[in-house]
Amino acid sequence: SRMVPVINKHGGVVDKFPGDGIMVMFNTVTKSDTYAADALRCVDDMCAACVAWGKEREAKGEKALELVWSVAAGPVVFGAVGDTTRLEYTVIGDSANMAAKLEKHTKEEAVHGLTTKETFDLAVSQGYQPPTPRNTLKTRIVGGVDEPIDLVTLVE
């Protein structure tokens, strides 16, 4: 419930809550010419909210949560998937799959957030200015991706 207002602020729409995650879409329900920048700004603000939440938890003697983030931009199909017995609205496509693969890949890179260099460059061209310097990770092998790709850290 803490993240949804942040997501809404940046024009994102929650697709689903798979397991302990949140799948968010940009530029699907509401058109945006800055969708990649919106997504990365959203991650920045969610990270800040998580830091504050972690401090609250630690003040109560609870453990802060360790969260990870991934962002991939590209075309998706948005709509109903399934049949008459089970129908679900969702997004499918290469960028949705890439985001899932990047989320898993954060462990290999020992970081808390990743995006593709292509998505990062698109966000910058849309006006995104990272609040802290980002590191580019060249020619990384990501499980399930055919060719090596360049990545950018979102959260170290």
Residue ranges and their predicted role:
Residues S1-G12, T28-W69, A73, D94-K104, ...:
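Alpha-helical scaffold within the catalytic cores of cyclic-nucleotide enzymes
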Residues V14-K16:
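A short pre-motif secondary-structure segment
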Residues P18, Y35, V77, V91-M98, ...:
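Helical mechanochemical/support elements of P-loop NTPase systems and associated helical scaffolds
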Residues G19-M23:
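Short beta-strand/turn "edge" motifs
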Residues M25-N27, L154:
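Short beta-strand-to-turn element immediately C-terminal to the catalytic PLP-Schiff-base lysine
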Residues V76, H105-E156:
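Cytosolic regulatory/linker segments at or just downstream of nucleotide-handling modules
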Residues A80-G82:
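Cytochrome P450 core scaffold surrounding the K-helix E-X-X-R motif
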